[in-house]
Amino acid sequence: MPGRADPSGGRAAVPVPLPVAVAAAPSPASVRSALPERSARPGGAGLRAKGFAITDLLGLEAELQPPPGAAPGPAGGYEGGGALGLGLGLLCGLAGPGAPCLLPAPLPLLPARGPRPGPPGPPPAARRHKESASDEDSLSGDASELKMPASQIKRKKRRHRTVFTAHQLEELEKAFNEAHYPDVYAREMLAVKTELPEDRIQVWFQNRRAKWRKREKCWGRSSVMAEYGLYGAMVRHSIPLPESIINSAKSGLVGSCAPWLLGMHKKSMEVSRKAESQEKPADGWQAEQDGEELQGKQASSQRSSEKLGPAKDPEDTAIDLSRTAKQEKRSVLRQCVNGDPTTEQKDRDH
C-alpha cells in the first residue's frame, strides 16, 4: 500500500495486525494534522474518508459505530479505546524520531475498558417489587416466630387428669368385677362412695373396658370378645338375654354356649337385686307410716261420730214417733168409719 510523504521526508510503514516495533515515530505535525479532522466531525456522526496518516493506517482512530436501533451502552467501550490509542500515538511522537515504540494491534480487538457489563438485571420496578416481597417475607417470618411460642403453649395445655386414690380405685375395680357396664343407678352409688363426679366414673369404665379388651385380645380369646360385645349392646339398648342362652345354662355355665355372658348377666342381676333389697326397707317403713296415718284418721273420725251420736238419736226417735202416731190415728179413723168389730171389742174392753 503506498504511503504518503510527510513533511519530514520519511515514508510511513505498512501496518501489521500484530504489535510491531516502529523504527521511525511520526512527527508531531502529522499528529496535529489528524486532530482537526477528528474534532471537525459534528458529534461523531457519519464516517469520513481514511487518510494516510499513521493514526489512520494503524487504526488508532477506528471507532465502531453502534448498529441501528441498538441501545447506547455505558460510557467507555471502544470510544474510550480510541482515545487511549491516540494518547499512545502522541507519546510515541513526542519520544522523538528513531525511538522504537510498541503499538497494539487494531483496537477493535481490544476489550472494553471499565467495568464489564454483566447480565441484564431486572428493571427497577421489578427490583422494588422483589425487595418489598422480601420485606414481607421477613415480616411474616418474624410474625410466625412470634406466634410459635403461643401455639406451643396452646399445645402444651392438656386436659386436667383425675388422680384416683387407692380407695377410689378399689371401689371402682370392685364395681367393674361385678358389672362392666354399670347403669346410671350403679354409677350414682359409686359417685357417692368415691366422691367423684358421675361423668368421670363413666369415663373410667370406658377406659377400663378398653384395657380389658386389649388384654383379652392378646390372650386370643375371640369368643369372649364376641360375648363381651354382645353384652355391651344388650346393656346399652336394654335388650334382654336370649332364651336360648338362658336355656343352655340349665346344666351349668361350663356347658353353655356363652359362659362369660351368662356370668356377667348373673352378676348384673345380683347387683339389681341388692339395689332392690336396699330400697325395700325404705318402702316398708313408708308403708308403715302410711298405715299409722290411716289408723289415726279412722280413730279421729270414730271419735267425732261418737260425739255427734247422742245429739242425733233423740231427733231420729222423735221423728219416728211422730210418724207412728200419725199412722195409728189414720188406722183408728178408718176403723171407725168402716165399723170394724175388732175396734168395738177393744173399746168395750177398755
From Swiss-Prot:
GO molecular function: DNA-binding transcription factor activity, RNA polymerase II-specific; transcription cis-regulatory region binding
Keywords from the UniProt entry: Developmental protein, DNA-binding, Homeobox, Nucleus, Sensory transduction, Transcription, Transcription regulation, Vision
Main localization of the protein described in the UniProt heading: nucleus
CDD domains: homeodomain (cd00086)
Motif Octapeptide motif mapped to chain: 52-59
Ranges of Pro residues composition bias in the record: 112-125
Region of interest (Disordered), residue spans: 27-47, 112-159, 271-350
Tissue distribution: Restricted to bipolar cells of the retina and spinal cord.
Composition bias, Low complexity: 27-36
Residue intervals of the CVC domain: 217-270
One Pfam family it belongs to: Homeodomain
GO biological process annotation, one example: visual perception
Signal peptide: none
Residues annotated to bind DNA: 157-216
Task performed by this protein: Binds to the 37-bp core of the locus control region (LCR) of the red/green visual pigment gene cluster. May regulate the activity of the LCR and the cone opsin genes at earlier stages of development. Dispensable in early retinal development.
Protein name: Visual system homeobox 1
Protein species of origin: Gallus gallus (Chicken)
The organism's taxonomic lineage, starting at the top: Eukaryota, Metazoa, Chordata, Craniata, Vertebrata
